[in-house]
Amino acid sequence: IRCQGSNQCYGHCREKTGCMNGKCINRVCKCYGC
């Protein structure tokens, strides 16, 4: 999803992928800790 900051990615990553962490890079969420 499009993001402004990394905090917008945490919930998205948890729900969609089960990953526990995420970062906003180039306005796109990248998920980590899968």
From Swiss-Prot:
Q: Which cysteines are joined by disulfide bonds?
A: 3-24, 9-29, 13-31, 19-34
Tissue localization of expression: Expressed by the venom gland.
Q: Which PROSITE patterns match?
A: SCORP_SHORT_TOXIN (PS01138)
Please name the Gene3D superfamilies in this protein's record: Knottin, scorpion toxin-like
Q: Return any one Pfam family short name.
A: Toxin_2
Its subcellular locations are: Secreted
Q: Care to name a GO molecular-function term for this sequence? A: ion channel inhibitor activity
Which terms are listed as keywords in the entry? Disulfide bond, Ion channel impairing toxin, Potassium channel impairing toxin, Secreted, Toxin
Chief subcellular location: secreted
A cellular component term, taken from the record's GO annotations:
extracellular region
| UniProt KW Metal-binding keyword | no
InterPro entries (alphabetical): Scorpion_toxin-like_sf (IPR036574), Scorpion_toxinS_K_inh (IPR001947)
Q: What is known of its domains?
A: Has the structural arrangement of an alpha-helix connected to antiparallel beta-sheets by disulfide bonds (CS-alpha/beta).
Similarity comment: Belongs to the short scorpion toxin superfamily. Potassium channel inhibitor family. Alpha-KTx 06 subfamily.
Additional information: Protein described in PubMed:18502464 elutes at 21.73 minutes, whereas protein described in PubMed:23684923 elutes at 21.22 minutes.
The UniProt function text for this chain reads: This toxin reversibly blocks Shaker B potassium-channels (expressed in insect Sf9 cells) with a Kd of 96.6 nM, and presents an even better affinity toward hKv1.3 (KCNA3), blocking it with a Kd of 17.7 nM.
Name of the molecule in the record:
Potassium channel toxin alpha-KTx 6.17
Q: Which organism does this record belong to? A: Opisthacanthus cayaporum
